[in-house]
């Protein structure tokens, strides 16, 4: 197998750590795809609540979670800088940087965009007769337009260019890979009465990365990009004029087909032919629909492909925030299970947020992962300059 594919598989192994005993886990069958960095939560606020964001209050980093939320933002514009030192339990030079921003057009629409850069640090290799150092990385650039159709409902559409250079060598048959994708999102936000309290209900949906397959060595080895469907709900409960709580939950499913499992009595050549017909030769759009019914374990395994996240946020005086959450993934699909905590501080001009991962498994490389977000409110900056 070519070194590039080995690099991709190595990255997946870093991300999908299985911590279950063999007696408890009889089948490990994760959904395989390229560009793993596209699935990493980029910002500290959502990461501090267990990786939720489809229906939370709109913020500057909504581009990743649900761009349809932007028309509901209070500020006219904003920009955020996000940084995550990734897998620090294993290596010290893998990092994710993410920049997002938006601008509201009038009262009912907004444009937004983001830049994601995932660095795998330096990799030393003795390919051929010479030693060399390569710096593999992945990146993406996207833009979206969101429109409020009513006072409570909005939609959004986005486009994305994805670029991946995971080469260990620079031979003629190797090349960086790229793909194009689109997003479709919806958001509902309304007030509901619970007793004598006027609470805020949010519902969201985001279908992300609907697009082409990505190929490093030609169409014969093309891989799926991580298309996914995210559904979320949130409820903000005011306590008094200065205090409020928000509880929220997300369900996320990869819209990528599952690699067929080799059957008893099936030869290796027969199995490879079936994998090619039922998986490798499947187009990206067909693969989205196929992903709902192709799990070898049937409906039970399809349910296991859904990742669940729950979170809560406490806000005091719109300035101080405390957050907590939990993220769950089935053992057979990757076993990413962890608690998260976080906090934030906000002023008129800027806000600073931090998120922290606490793994339920002792040897999970995601344990103790930190995320940092520095966001700027353009209305606040404008008011400051007028003084």
List the model feature ranges, each with a label.
Residues 16-20:
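Boundary at the C-terminal end of the N-terminal hydrophobic targeting segment
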Residues 4-14:
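Sec-dependent N-terminal signal peptides
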Residues 21-387:
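Subset of outer-membrane beta-barrel
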Residues 1-4, 151:
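Positively charged n-region of N-terminal signal peptides that target proteins for export
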């Amino acid at each position: 197998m070519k070194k590039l594919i080995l690099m991709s598989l190595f990255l997946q192994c870093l991300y999908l750590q299985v911590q279950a005993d063999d007696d408890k886990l009889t089948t490990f069958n994760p959904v395989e795809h390229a560009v793993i960095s596209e699935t990493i939560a980029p910002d500290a606020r959502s990461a501090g609540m267990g990786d939720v964001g489809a229906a939370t209050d709109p913020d500057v980093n909504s581009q990743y979670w649900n761009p349809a939320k932007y028309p509901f933002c209070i500020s006219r514009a904003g920009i955020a800088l996000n940084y995550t030192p990734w897998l620090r339990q294993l290596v010290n030079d893998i990092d994710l940087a993410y920049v997002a921003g938006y601008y509201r057009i009038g009262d009912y629409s907004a444009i937004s965009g983001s830049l994601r850069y995932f660095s795998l640090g330096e990799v030393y290799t003795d390919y051929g007769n010479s030693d060399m150092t390569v710096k593999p990385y992945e990146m993406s650039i996207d833009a979206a337009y969101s429109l409020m159709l009513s006072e409570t409902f909005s939609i959004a559409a986005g486009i994305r260019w994805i670029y991946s250079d995971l080469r260990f060598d620079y031979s003629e048959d190797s090349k960086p890979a790229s793909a194009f994708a689109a997003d479709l999102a919806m958001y509902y936000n309304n007030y509901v009465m619970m007793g004598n309290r006027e609470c805020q209900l949010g519902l969201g949906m985001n279908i992300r990365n609907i697009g082409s397959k990505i190929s490093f060595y030609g169409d014969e080895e093309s891989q799926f990009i991580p298309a996914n469907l995210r559904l979320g709900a949130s409820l903000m409960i005011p306590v008094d004029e200065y205090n409020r709580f928000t509880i929220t939950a997300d369900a996320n499913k990869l819209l990528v087909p599952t690699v067929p499992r080799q059957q008893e009595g099936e030869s290796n050549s027969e199995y490879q032919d079936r994998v090619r017909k039922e998986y490798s030769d499947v187009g990206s759009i067909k693969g989205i629909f196929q992903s709902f019914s192709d799990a070898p374990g049937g409906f039970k395994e399809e349910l296991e492909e859904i990742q669940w996240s729950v979170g809560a946020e406490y806000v005091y005086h719109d300035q101080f925030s405390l957050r907590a959450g939990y993220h769950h993934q089935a053992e057979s699909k990757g076993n990413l299970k962890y608690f998260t905590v976080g906090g934030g501080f906000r002023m008129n001009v800027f806000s600073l947020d931090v998120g922290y991962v606490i793994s339920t498994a002792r040897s999970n490389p995601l344990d103790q992962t930190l995320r940092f977000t520095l966001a700027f409110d353009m209305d606040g900056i404008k008011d400051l300059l007028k003084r």
